[in-house]
Amino acid sequence: MDKLAIQASPPLAGDVIISGAKNAALPILMAGVLAETDFIVSNVPNLRDVSTSCKLLRCLGADVDELGNGQIRISTKNLNEFCAPYDLVKTMRASILILGPLLARYGTADVSLPGGCAIGARPVNLHLHGLEMMGAKIEVKEGYIKARVDGRLKGAHIFMDMVSVGATENLLMAAALADGETVIENAAREPEVIDLANCLIAMGAKITGVGSATLRIQGVERLQGCEYRVMPDRIETGSFLVAAAVTRGRIRCLKADPASLESVIAKLEDAGAKITTGEDWIELDMEGKRPKAVNIKTAPYPGFPTDMQAQFCVLNVLAQGTATITETIFENRFMHVPELIRMGANMELEGNTCIIQGIESLSGAQVMATDLRASASLVIAGLVADGKTIVDRIYHLDRGYEHIEQKFQGLGAHVERVQ
């Protein structure tokens, strides 16, 4: 099984090209099921979850051609299966996003209950409740969600009990082909939801309120394929910016989207980083200084993203001062903390809050990745730890970061993939 071997590295320096956003690409690929003609998606990152999504679409009978250069073409003319099996779904929670498109277009869907990162209860009840309000008959048995609808789904007024990105996306796709108007209140406002909505609009969907907490979808009878470019990955961007801050370096992230990262940029500036942005680039310069501790509380967008919490734990571990990090989105999302403590970090957990006293340096150790973003934090810690750090189980990392070791090497880091 692959590992990453990391030696203490100089301050990161240079340019890094940001990949397409995994969390936008996955729902957009699933939206291909809604299109009656060929659908071409570009800027798709080369990741394990993307490969799983393509396998899932092929398993349903869709023709999926990887055209190279991050382009994927999807044709549904031969789609004739409506079951997303356990062996595919267990590795990727986003497989649940096939439910809305299959049900809306074909009236039937059997989807295994999902797997993915082990970061707490991420219930699918919001997805199911919304679809039931649109007229679907759903039962959960033998580990599968079995959903049926006679004719078309019906427009409905849906209030989400809690903000859920996945449920918003599933219901948005389902509503695009429903009969009548659907209103989704307390909808997620994440940039990836906006990207999916813009893709659906390019396919012919009628959606208003994009980017707000109230989405209105006037269902249409059919959607056509289009060509659509996936937005840049804001979490990958943020991860490299934090790595540069921790190593006291200076980097530029190219093909990025500064507008989607305002809360992260604000916290990096609080930590002492000098940040300059253009339309599609972000430059961070620590001017050789140690970062200052910053308090973090995760929240749905436009608040601070839970997917950047682990990386800021590392920043605070090596910062001047004391900080608290409070996780409000997922429970069980501090699994990186025991690993960082093994490297010498001074941190303790109290419920959903981590209290961190900054120290000057860490020691290299063998550590284990437990989920996608935790693994990124361990890599960043390894860059500034004395000696050698080995990160095990990096298949988590490969689910969300494209060519991570090559990108770090390009910035001067001593990172290599080993068996």
UniProtKB/Swiss-Prot annotation:
The active site is at residue 117. Cell wall formation. Adds enolpyruvyl to UDP-N-acetylglucosamine. The keyword Cell wall biogenesis/degradation applies. UDP-N-acetyl-alpha-D-glucosamine binds at residues 93, 307, 329. Belongs to the EPSP synthase family. MurA subfamily. It comes from the Bacteria. GO terms for cellular component: cytoplasm. It catalyses: phosphoenolpyruvate + UDP-N-acetyl-alpha-D-glucosamine = UDP-N-acetyl-3-O-(1-carboxyvinyl)-alpha-D-glucosamine + phosphate. This is UDP-N-acetylglucosamine 1-carboxyvinyltransferase. CDD domains: UdpNAET. GO terms for molecular function: UDP-N-acetylglucosamine 1-carboxyvinyltransferase activity. Pathway: Cell wall biogenesis; peptidoglycan biosynthesis. The modification 2-(S-cysteinyl)pyruvic acid O-phosphothioketal is found at residue 117. Keywords: Cell cycle, Cell division, Cell shape, Cell wall biogenesis/degradation, Cytoplasm, Peptidoglycan synthesis, Pyruvate, Transferase. Its EC number is 2.5.1.7. It is an enzyme of class 2 (transferase).
